[in-house]
């Protein structure tokens, strides 16, 4: 798939999706109260990504769920005793929850919430790409379909990608990476590994621009620049901190700067402001009206998660995630490798603390 074809496919997909309608304060309060009751009645737990609407994030926290990056979401859903997991995020997150928890019911506010990285990496084309390079270890980003994961040797998230590729490189393995070329390029540069890249990108992060960021830094010279590695290399080069969502949140909490220019989805501002209320957060500039995204610096698919469709799925159960048993087994292996590796990595870090 060419870059132009990829972008057209994403635009066509977005044209058929709808964001939740704006709600009044009283409507929100009523929906939230009903959702809390429904979660208890259904023995369900709400797991939300940092990029979802602040109302969804707050509700997850208030009801004993979690707000996290994709790795922690996977862990939490796997370990929580609830019989139903409601995933507020995008489709690959729901699929991952089902792969790790086949005995649980996994629901999403909408199954139409996908990801440009997922859309831009069709399983059949990716499998052909892998077949052309049988000597390479296949490493795929979590932002992929279950079918793509099933073709992989390893699954990674942005928080563990560098460590896993370093581990593989130390063993002399050459890497085939998909789908995000910017994250893959960053990992390639920081590890020195031999990495062959699939040509995919995130429609939100790709819109951050070096020139605009340079101008903004001139206006806020004391601000630290925080960048997600799905951003273009020129933007990454300007960063004071490059990291996953959880790593960027930690930076806001721990760095002495009072101001931060943040180059990732602005849904993260809710958690950043919650944990560091005295810090000033500034959105990094994007391509403006020429951007693919409906609302620059915010994923249009994450925005599809709303209170109304959350209540609907709890009451009706019609947005359930299903993964074929054979496909699930194949996708589980690389996911388990990631979870086991990161668990061991955390144990070693604790031992050295």
UniProtKB/Swiss-Prot annotation:
What's the encoding gene here?
nadA
Per UniProt, what is one GO molecular function of this protein? metal ion binding
Amino acids binding iminosuccinate: 49, 70, 141-143, 158, 228-230, 245
Name by which UniProt lists this protein: Quinolinate synthase
Compartments annotated for it: namely:
Cytoplasm
Going by the UniProt record, its keywords in alphabetical order are: 4Fe-4S, Cytoplasm, Iron, Iron-sulfur, Metal-binding, Pyridine nucleotide biosynthesis, Transferase
Q: Name one GO biological process term.
A: 'de novo' NAD biosynthetic process from L-aspartate
- Give the GO cellular component terms, alphabetically: cytosol
Q: Which cofactor does it need?
A: [4Fe-4S] cluster
């Amino acid at each position: 798939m060419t870059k132009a074809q990829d972008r057209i496919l994403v635009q066509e997909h977005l044209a058929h999706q709808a964001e939740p309608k704006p709600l009044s304060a009283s409507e929100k309060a009523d929906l939230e109260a009903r959702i809390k009751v429904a979660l208890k009645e259904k023995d369900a737990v709400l797991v939300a990504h940092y990029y979802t609407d602040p109302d969804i994030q707050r509700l997850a926290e208030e009801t004993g769920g979690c707000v996290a990056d994709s790795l922690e979401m996977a862990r939490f859903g796997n370990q929580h005793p609830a019989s139903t997991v409601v995933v507020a995020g995008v489709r690959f997150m729901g699929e991952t929850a089902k792969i790790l928890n086949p005995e649980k019911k996994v629901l999403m506010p909408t199954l139409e919430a996908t990801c440009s990285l997922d859309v831009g990496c069709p399983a059949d084309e990716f499998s052909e790409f892998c077949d052309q390079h049988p000597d390479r270890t296949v490493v795929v980003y979590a932002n992929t379909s279950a079918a793509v994961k099933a073709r992989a040797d390893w699954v990674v998230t942005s928080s563990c990608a560098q460590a896993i590729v370093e581990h593989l490189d130390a063993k002399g393995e050459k890497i085939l990476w998909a789908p995000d070329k910017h994250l893959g390029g960053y990992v390639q540069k920081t590890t020195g590994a031999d990495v062959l890249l699939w040509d995919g990108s995130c429609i939100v992060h790709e819109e951050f621009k070096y020139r605009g960021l340079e101008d903004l830094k001139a206006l806020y010279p004391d601000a630290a620049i925080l960048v997600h590695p799905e951003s273009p290399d020129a933007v990454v080069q300007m960063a004071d901190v490059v990291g996953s969502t959880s790593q960027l949140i930690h930076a806001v909490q721990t760095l002495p700067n009072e101001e931060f220019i943040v180059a990732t989805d602005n849904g993260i501002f809710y958690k950043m402001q919650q944990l560091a209320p005295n810090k000033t957060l500034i959105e990094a500039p994007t391509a403006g009206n020429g951007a693919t995204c409906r609302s620059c610096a915010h994923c249009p698919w994450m925005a599809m998660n709303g209170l109304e469709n959350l209540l609907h799925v709890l009451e009706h159960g019609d947005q359930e995630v299903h993964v074929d048993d054979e496909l699930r087994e194949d996708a589980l292996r690389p996911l388990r490798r990631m979870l086991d590796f990161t668990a061991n990595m955390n144990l070693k870090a604790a031992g050295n603390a």
